[in-house]
Amino acid sequence: YKAGDADSSDDTRFGYTKENCWEAIRAALLFVENVERVPDMEDAEKKRLAAEAKVIVASRYFDLFRHFGGLPLIKETYDVQPSYELPRATVEETVNYMINLLDEAAATPQLPWDLGTDDTNWQGRFTKAAAMGLKCKILLFAASPLFNDNVPYCTEPPQDAVTNHQVWYGAYKPELWDQCLQACVDFFTELQSRGYYELTQATEATAKGYRDAYNKAYFTRENNKELLISTHISRFGKFNSWDEWQYIFVNSGNGTVITGGLTPTLEFMEMFPMSNGEPFQLNTATDLFYTDNDYNKPIRDPRLYETMLVNGTQFGDHAAELWIGGRDNINDTEKETGKYATGFGCYKFYKEGVNSLKDKYLQWPYLRLAEMYLIYAEALLKSKNDLPGAIEQVNKVRARVGLGDLAVCNPGKNLTTDADALLEEILRERACELGLEDVRLFDMTRYKREDLFRKQLHGLKIYRNDGGGNTPWSGSTGNSSIYPKPTKFTHEAFPLVNPSRAWWSNFSPKWYLSAFPPSE
């Protein structure tokens, strides 16, 4: 929302008619309606492709649903005609439509559980596992307080959508959590029987091994058995020989990363625990990221280094210098501008920029097995109040990167008895594991976390503590000939104000969802 409001000339964060959702839905429905007419295709292939098309419809409906709530339910294609209108369905009707499509797809014998080795060149196609997993993800969102509560998410006028149950169920329904849990049980029962999918594990129990495993889990397309659904950038033409990669996002002078659009905050950095799984404490930490600023001695959760660029990380031919005046951060943080405005940089999916991504086939995970374990954990907690069971599922995700037992690492939080505290840890774990994978914003909206939306965010100013001043150490302008490599730093948290977010001082719960265009 621009300047705290939205009007008919503005685009919301997800355009109702501008994200190719309806085009994809129509194309998929058109395929389902006509595939049987294809004369030279085997019947098994027809049924498989029709099932995949149904998953496409459900996935695109879900993309809209988590932004708008109840939607018009299109179940057939329309010919060109002067006008046609469909009413907006309730939240319950919209969820049921998506789930029925996924159930129909999963029940199709010709839809394979996995792509296997024979179909690895078809990465991105939907499978039975994808259909069952997406069902869990949809039910998790539907069961959450945004739609499933005794009070509507917004009480500001007009209230037509509230009265018509188009933005909530009308009351709290605990059975929705039961449905989510059952969907998870069904998925993992099938996984135990069918196999194939697994968390990408480290080949060696070292910091590098754990980081490499996480990198492969979210970043690698080929031979990735953790991916249930992957998506790719849709862009016409090529830039710099990048196949299906959005050049403007990465490298242009006004690109998103270059101008600081994805710059991590101090609050996000603090979510990542120490390398043993214990919470990170900024106020008592001597070193924040590496022992003595040596990138061969990391001390934090390996996922941190794959998610954000931090001071001291190996960065091309040198250790990243993100202190004020450093080689990589001459004045970004001081002026709160550019890709290091907060004292950190975006690393996940961006890596080291244009040269590191050149000629890569890149994908964003839409659903990974790691997320399935975290969905299962949340469903166990909310449906059965099974705290030990929930912790067990979270630990499977943490163990992949070498972190210890969640409850043992947080003895003061009483995670085996305090359900609210455990939920906070599950949401934090989701933020760390699934950062930049289109999850955190929706975790905040589905739990109606006005406190987090209003929370002032911070950056971190870093200063050399060796007498070398606000200057680079390495590179042509560095003073490495005079000073040894800096090992200690002074840190100063500062509020982010360039610009300040409108909702910090003027939040409205209506912003949990996006606005429909006035023409609709």
Where are these regions (language model features)?
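Amphipathic alpha-helical repeat scaffolds of TPR domains
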Residues: A53, A58-R60, A130-P145
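Short coil/turn linking the two alpha-helices of tandem helical-hairpin repeats
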Residues: F65-R66, P72, I138-N150, K382-N385
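Carboxylate/His-rich catalytic cores and anion/metal-binding grooves
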Residues: V57-Y61, E306-T307, N311-K335
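Short edge-strand/loop segments of extracellular domains
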Residues: T77-Q81, E392-L403
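Conserved, well-structured interaction surfaces
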Residues: Y1-F68, P82-Q123, N293, P298, ...
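Long, intrinsically disordered, low-complexity segments
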Residues: C21, Y97-I99, W122, P152-Y153, ...
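Short coil/linker segments at helix-helix boundaries
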Residues: G70-R88, L146-Q179
